[in-house]
Structure formats: structure tokens, C-alpha cells
Amino acid sequence: MPSMRVTTDTWPRRAAQEPLLLLLLRSSLMKSASLQALNPNRAMAAMGRSVRVVLDSSVLLDPSGVTAEEEEVVVALRPGAEALLRRLRYSNLRVAICHPEGLPTNESGFLEKTAKLYSFGYMPLTSPSGSNLLNELMLEWSGTNFCFYVTSGVHEGLLSELQNHNWEVIAMGNEDVIKNSGVIHISMLQELLITLATSIKKEIGNSSAFVVGYVMKQSREEDFAKRGAFPIYPSKNDLIFVPLSFELPLASQLQEVDLVLHKITDEIINIDPNSSISFPKGISFSPGMSEIIRFVEEHCDFCVIDPFKNIYPLLDRIQIQEILIRLEGLSAEGRPKLRAPCFLKIESFCGSELQKQLAEAKLSFPLIVKPQVACGVADAHNMALIFKIEEFSNLSVPLPAILQEYIDHGSKIFKFYAIGDKIFHAIKNSMPNASHLKSSSGGKPLTFNSLKTLPVATKEQLLQNEVQDSKLLDINLVEEAAKLLKELLGLTIFGFDVVVQESSGDHVIVDLNYLPSFKEVPDNVAMPAFWDAIKQSYESRKQMTQT
């Protein structure tokens, strides 16, 4: 990583051009259709000013380069830049990439393609006419925008011009080189997002603004981010989201954020199934997650959404069953029966012993076999549908396991999401009735992964079972169940699946999970509910710790 330098006699071409940055930036952003798509009116709603981030090429390009056999330098992003750009793309910040005039064609072309890929503005710094307007334009920008210029090399003239017009300069490199300059220093590119987040919060000066640090696997983060869930620019209710990086000291990051939103199960390395009834004993977490857990234990007033102890029961399908059984009191005369599926825990697939257990539990075929561990490990979603006792032989589902009755439900599943105080639901196609599955099984157990290869009813099967969905479901009953589950679980955001048994009309809750994706809920409805749920939960928990 190059050191940061202050100089008046090096980089002469760049020194002459860099003060023109704002004029060029304005021109480029006005022409950028991709940035117009970010909807400035939406962005202005939270604090009345857009936030613009200009990334100099020096912080993006790998300074080492890679020399190929032909002695040509291979242009590449420096480590950490790809993740940074991916997150900035959905941050609701106005982002542009700039570089000095005279940059080699392969480098400028690479930067232009990169800007296009991430929907950023792009500008080579060339000499415009009418440079006497420069100061007026700089003043105009600083009056209507909160602006950051990010670089790994700072020219004194540019630094002075930017600071005179209220630009924040973030410099990556050696802090000792520039002293008393007002420059914000970072050592690594991975520090930039949390630096932006805390600077924006400071600029807002609003006690209702909170920085939310979040932890989850990359694929889940990207899914949420693409839907606008994690803006660094404040949400409508003043939440600023920033990912916590395991590449940086976590203690300092946790001191900068107000709360942590997490999907703790994404950070599970291993679970001892023999300890599942006494979670968290027997769970091995990633080093980063383990450090967060220790920090929270040592700082009892620190807010996490949601408390780890409230989530552990959802890792065990036996404990989930026991929670769902407590909902059966909601059933009343004149209403459908609300219940959990009938089940049995087993330690072995031994035929003779199993036959006896099934008789005692009053379970009959077909049965779904599920691992007792509900999530956090690779095989937690490997399941099987069994039609007769002989099919347990050589079954690959991990033990211990639970056997659940298979419920004919007309190939419809109702997915419910509790997001704070709001409850949403969606209807999805599901597995066919047992008779269809048995005829296609070829006399073998039907094995599947419930996240990837779940057998779904065909169009013909759906037509055979066609019933108006509104007549199938007692929404009021299930919403009452959602409210009771919220009390029992102590969770801010959770989901559960309901099927309606064709023969009886029973409403059976077949799955329960923490922080689902709720993809089926329209983003314009789901995201405000998501932000409100987080803020309300934080404020409620803070009140509890202060009383």
C-alpha cells in the first residue's frame, strides 16, 4: 500500500487538473443516467442533502500491478475494492470514480468499465473552458451536498480548495505525512464505509439517527442490499447501515455503531447434534462472531437485534415443535384448529425399534424426515419423504432426526412474516399431495434439500387442487398466532410457514425461522417496515436497560 504524500512539486499534471474536480463531477453526474436512477428526491428526504462520494483512482487500482510474460501490466482493483464498490452501489450515496488526465489507456478504460458495472459516475480530469466559474460551482456543491473526496495521495492545492468549500477529504495511507490538515485518515480501504457512516451521522447532528452495524453472509447481504435494505445514506427513519468487517478490529467498530443486526446462524462453523437441546453449548462460531458475542456479554447495555439467547431455540427442530405446541390454545369453537405437525424424535433408523416408536406416537406414513439441527450447518436442510418402513434403510438424513406427518395441503403454502408490529403473508406453490409423490417415487424414499430441490407441484396437479386461497386460510387466526409467537420468541423479525390440511382444515405451522428474506413482500412496503422494526426494537431495548 503506497504512502500518502503532500507535495507541491510532484505529479505536476495531476496538480494542475485536480482542482477542476467539482466542475467535472457536476457535468458527469448530470449526464449519468445510472445515477439519475437513484432518485435524488428519495435521497433528500432523510436529511435534506445528498451525499456525494468521489473515489480517486489511487484508492481503487492495485498499485503493485501484475506483470505478465509480455511485460504488460495487468490492471486490477486493490484488495478490498470489489467489496467496497459492491456495497456502495446500493448505499443510496452518489458515487463517482475519477482519475487524472494522462492515465494509461488500459487503466482509464478499466476504470470506465468499472464505473459502468457498478452504475457510478465516471470522469477523466481534462481541461474545461470557463474555469473562472470553478469557485462558484464549488460553493454551490458544498451548499447543497455533503461531499467526500477519497484518495491515497493529497495535493496541497487541491486539499486547500476542497476544505475551503466544506468537502471532507478521506486519505488512505500514512497519517504522519499530513498533520493538522483536517484530513480524515484511514489505514485500509475496509475502513472507508464505517468512516462514511460515522461522518454522515455527525453531519446530521440528529439524536434520532443511529448507525446499524450488520453481520451476515455475503449472499444474504447482497440480496437485502439490492432491495435497498442497507443504505449508508440515512433511511427515512434515520438509520445508517454499515457492514462490520472481520478484517478490522471489531472492538473499535462496535464502539462506533449504536446496535448490531445479525444473522448469527450464518457464522456457525459446526454444531454438535448431541448438544442441540442445550444450545449454545456445542456450537462453534467463526472467530469474528465469537468476538462479537464476547463483546455483547461484557457490555450488557449494548443492543443486538436480536438477543442471541432468543435465537438459539430456532436451531433445534424439537424446540421449535415445543414452541408451536403452545399456540394450540388459540383454537376455539367455530374456528379452524391451529397446531404443530405430529412428530417423533429418533436416534436411529433401526426398523424394529422404529416400528414400535411410530405406533406409540400414532404416526402413519407418509412421513417427512428432517435433521434435528434446523440451520447453520450444510446438511440441516437435507430431508426425505418416506412411504414405508423399509425405506429407512440406508437413509442419508443426519441423526438425530425428527419424523413429521406429511400433510396433504393442496400444494399451497402460506408464508408469514412478522416484521416488528407488522405482519405480511404470501402464497406460494408447494409440494404435491402424497399420492402424486408416491406414484413418482419409484418405490424409493424421495430425498431433497428444502432450500434447493424441494419438489413442487406441476401445473396439472395445481389445477386438480384448485381452491380459492382466501377460503382456505383464516388470516385472523394466523395473525393472532404471529403476535403470540412474537411474545414467546422475543424476536423482532421472524417468519413461519402454514399449510391447511385438506381433510380437516387444520392450520399447521410447519416451519419457523429468524430474519427471513421476506422476498415475497414488495420492497416499497417491506423496507420501511424493516427499518421501523429495527428502530423500534432498539429504542425499546434501550429503555429497558435504562430502567
From Swiss-Prot:
Residues involved in Mg(2+) 1 binding: D497, D511
Segment forming the signal sequence: none
Nucleotide-binding among keywords: yes
Keywords, in A-Z order: ATP-binding, Kinase, Magnesium, Metal-binding, Nucleotide-binding, Transferase
Residues that, per the record, bind Mg(2+) 2: D511, N513
Cofactor: Mg(2+)
Oligomer and partners: Monomer.
Protein name: Inositol-tetrakisphosphate 1-kinase 6
Species of origin: Oryza sativa subsp. japonica (Rice)
Lineage of origin: Eukaryota, Viridiplantae, Streptophyta, Embryophyta, Tracheophyta
